[in-house]
From Swiss-Prot:
GO terms for cellular component: cytoplasm. PROSITE patterns: RF_PROK_I. Residues 285-305 are annotated as: Disordered. Pfam families: PCRF (PF03462), RF-1 (PF00472). Methylated by PrmC. Methylation increases the termination efficiency of RF1. This is Peptide chain release factor 1. The gene is prfA. The modification N5-methylglutamine is found at Q235. Keywords: Cytoplasm, Methylation, Protein biosynthesis. GO terms for molecular function: translation release factor activity, codon specific. It is found in: Cytoplasm. NCBIfam families: prfA, PRK00591.1.
């Protein structure tokens, strides 16, 4: 791994020379590409520097422990060493995930669609819990979070929730969240304390960039309907036709948005979701053969594939694709998703190395 890091650090030095040349500003496209690469390489360098510093601290503490006679100091040193070992393991996993060769689509914004599945109202409540989890995770990463569409259930959960997340490395870390998420817990409505199993499905759709010239949607292929927005229970909450339903006739993809009071805003949001769904379908079709091998390695991202189980009574979360089990579900639900997302990226990297891709 150190050899690979050295290669990237050499590349960082080259990039810094290039972006310091005033002539680079005359080529905005090249400057933009180099700036993105520089940010990525700098993040990798910072992660590696933290590892080197912590390794030195560990070495010094171990040396001190070998000659320490005071029992209290021995205990303190041992505790510090154990804590730093855990931290070093986390940092190494983060570095491994950063060593995954950058994909041009890594920084694409994503649209996440969460839907209640098996379990009725309890599944809808878990959608709400996951919405909060991803919101907190996005905030911790400095990403922008936006509600695109939401359909509440009777107990204030969500039958469906669609959100947009934008920022650096969004797709890179969130792409493996697609699939079926199973929850095992005692529902609030359960009077006998029995554990119920429910499930929700999540789709992660990369949002086409403005530079994406391949995705062209002809206005003639769209059927746009407007109607009055309605709230829970079917009551009307708007007396104007602000809700929008867009149908893409060639593919049959249908998107409805009614959360905004403005028809124009609802149409804009619906179009964003529509484009992301069409792009996703095209990419799946185009890369079907190439992704067959990869899907066997890290999960297909198919919404029918069970990827993760959240067991609340055991405070356990298990990702079935890589056999990762953590006993800190409480922290995960508070947005501490890095141990899972970085492990998935790292796993993908090792699979790419193993298969020579």
């Amino acid at each position: 791994m150190k050899k690979k890091v050295a290669e990237y650090l050499n590349r960082l030095a080259e990039v810094e020379i290039k972006i310091s040349n005033p002539e680079i500003f005359s080529n905005s496209k090249e400057y933009s590409a180099l700036s993105k690469e520089h940010s990525y390489l700098l993040e990798l360098k910072n992660a590696y520097d933290k590892i080197l510093n912590l390794e030195k601290v560990l070495a010094d503490d171990k040396q001190a422990l070998a000659i320490e006679k005071d029992p209290e100091m021995v205990v303190m040193l041992e505790e510090g060493i154990n804590e730093n070992k855990v931290e070093l393991e986390k940092l190494n996993k983060i570095l491994e995930s950063l060593l995954v060769p950058p994909d041009p689509d890594d920084d694409l914004n994503v649209i996440m669609e969460l839907r209640a599945g098996t379990g009725g109202e309890e599944a809808a409540l878990f959608v709400g819990d996951c919405v909060r989890m991803y919101h907190l995770y996005a905030s911790s990463k400095g990403w922008k979070y936006e509600v695109l569409s939401a359909s509440e259930s009777d107990l204030k959960g969500y039958k469906e929730y669609v959100m947009g997340i934008s920022g650096t490395g969004v797709k890179r870390l969130l792409q493996y969240e697609a699939g079926t998420h199973r929850v095992q817990r005692v529902p609030e409505t359960e009077t006998q304390g029995r554990v119920h199993t429910s499930a929700i499905t999540i789709a992660v759709l990369p949002e086409p960039s403005e530079e994406d010239t391949e995705l062209l949607i002809n206005e003639k292929d769209l059927k746009i309907d407007t109607f009055r927005a309605s709230g829970a229970g079917g009551q009307h909450v708007n007396v104007t036709d602000s809700a929008v339903r867009i149908t893409h006739l060639p593919t049959g993809v249908v998107v409805t948005c009614q959360d905004e009071r403005s028809q124009h805003k609802n149409k804009d949001k619906a179009m964003r979701i529509l484009k992301a769904r069409i792009r996703d379908a095209e990419m799946q079709k185009r890369h079907n053969e190439a992704s067959a091998m990869r899907s066997a390695q890290v999960g297909s991202g198919d919404r029918s594939e069970r990827i993760r189980t959240y067991n609340f009574s055991q405070n356990r979360v298990t990702d079935h694709r890589i056999g990762l089990t953590l006993y800190n579900l409480d922290k995960v639900m508070e947005g501490d998703l890095d141990p899972i997302t970085t492990a998935m990226v790292s796993h993908a990297y090792h699979q790419l190395l193993e298969h020579g891709n």
